Curated annotation (Swiss-Prot):
Species, as recorded: Vaccinia virus (strain Western Reserve) (VACV)
Similarity section: Belongs to the orthopoxvirus VLTF-2/OPG126 family.
Top-level taxon of origin: Viruses
Record carries keyword Transcription regulation: yes
Pfam annotation, one family: zf-FCS
Record's protein name: Viral late gene transcription factor 2
Gene responsible for this protein: OPG126
GO molecular function, one term: identical protein binding
Subunit field text: Interacts with itself. Interacts with the late transcription factors VLTF-1/OPG093.
Length: 150
């Protein structure tokens, strides 16, 4: 039988079996020799904090941000609709913490932008809203369908 040994001065805070060292940022791009890099640019993110990044309205209250996978925040938005709409556009480029629930096309698509902005303002404080928009190619109309279970 094995003898039990007590070590009162030894503290195991992170055993190697469960401790995983934090990795630095992954390499961005590794090209084989037969490829030629045509552009390699690093640019800081937008620093505008007084306008919504989606609808460009003035932010008169505390803005909402997109939460990233690593716990950071990106962007400044006036509503969850604006936040989720932009998040659905950038989710293939930005690692998001959660899947966006709303997806609208950029305002440049709409002839009557004020109608879209009025919808955003009307539903700004509503919880549980989800949905999307649908482009009807034959009639060149965009149907916005937002719903709630609450």
């Amino acid at each position: 039988m094995a003898k039990r040994v007590s070590l009162p001065d030894v503290v195991i805070s992170a055993p190697k079996a469960v401790f995983k060292p934090a990795k630095e940022e992954a390499l961005a791009c590794i090209l084989p020799k037969y490829y030629k890099s045509m552009a390699d640019v690093s640019i800081k993110t937008n620093s505008v904090i007084d306008k919504c990044w989606f609808c460009n309205q003035d932010l008169v209250f505390k803005p909402i941000s997109i939460e990233t996978f690593k716990g950071g925040e990106v962007g400044y938005f006036c509503s969850k609709i604006c936040r989720d709409s932009l998040a659905s556009m950038v989710k293939s480029h930005v690692a998001l913490r959660e899947e966006p629930k709303i997806s609208l096309l950029p305002l440049v698509f709409y002839e009557d932008k004020e109608k879209v902005i009025n919808t955003i303002n009307l539903l700004r404080d509503k919880d549980g809203v989800y949905g999307s928009c649908y482009f009807k190619e034959n009639s060149q109309i965009i149907d916005i369908s937002l719903r709630s279970l609450l």
